[in-house]
Regions:
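Conserved AdoMet/S-adenosylmethionine-binding subsite of the radical SAM
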Residues: 1-124
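Class I S-adenosyl-L-methionine
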Residues: 68, 102, 136-143
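A structural motif corresponding to the C-terminal lobe/cap of the Radical SAM core domain
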Residues: 125-141
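A cross-taxonomic marker for long C-terminal extensions/tails that follow the last structured domain
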Residues: 139-153
C-alpha cells in the first residue's frame, strides 16, 4: 500500500521505491508489488541449499527462482551476498554462485557484505567475522566471472 500511495501521489512520484528482501516470495506475490516497485535487492545467504538451510532454516530454491524472475522482468537491482567465513566463502561455492548469477547477467549489481557479530541473535554470535581479505577474494571471484558492479561492505 505504501508504494502504491507513493506512485499515485503526484507530490511523491519523484521518489524511488526499492524493496529489500530475502527473496522468499513467489511470482504471484511479485506480480502484485512489482508494478509499484522500481527495483528489488535480494539477499542470497548461500548458493548451496544445505548451507542456506543451516543458516536460515529454509531452502534457497524460492530465492533463486525470485532472482531469476526479477531479472527476467527487469526489476532485479542488486544481489546481496552475506559472507560468513567457514560457511559460504569456499572458492568452489563462490565460483558456483558467480557462475549461476552470470548466467542471468553480469550486469547485475553484486553487494558483498561481510558478516559482523554486532547486533546478531545469540545463536549466530559464534560465527566468524569476514575480514577485508576474505571480501576481496570474493570480489575477485565475481570479477573473474565478468561482473563489473561489485561493492564491498
Amino acid at each position: 500500500e505504501l508504494f502504491n500511495s507513493i506512485k499515485i501521489d503526484s507530490s511523491l512520484k519523484h521518489l524511488s521505491t526499492m524493496l529489500d528482501t530475502n527473496g522468499s516470495a513467489e511470482s504471484s506475490t511479485w506480480n502484485k508489488i512489482l508494478p509499484v516497485t522500481d527495483g528489488v535487492m535480494v539477499d542470497l545467504k548461500a548458493f548451496d541449499d544445505k548451507v542456506h538451510q543451516k543458516l536460515t532454516g529454509t531452502s534457497n530454491v524460492q530465492v533463486l527462482q525470485s532472482i531469476q524472475y526479477l531479472h527476467e522482468v527487469d526489476k532485479l537491482f542488486e544481489v546481496r551476498l552475506l559472507i560468513i567465513p567457514g560457511w559460504n566463502d569456499q572458492e568452489s561455492m563462490l565460483q558456483k554462485t558467480a557462475e549461476w548469477l552470470s548466467q542471468q547477467s553480469t550486469n547485475i549489481s553484486i553487494k558483498i557484505l561481510g558478516f559482523r557479530q554486532h547486533g546478531v541473535r545469540s545463536e549466530y554470535s559464534h560465527l566468524q567475522q569476514a575480514t577485508p581479505e576474505v571480501l576481496e577474494k570474493v570480489s575477485r571471484t565475481f570479477h573473474d566471472f565478468g561482473f563489473k558492479r561489485i561493492q564491498l561492505v
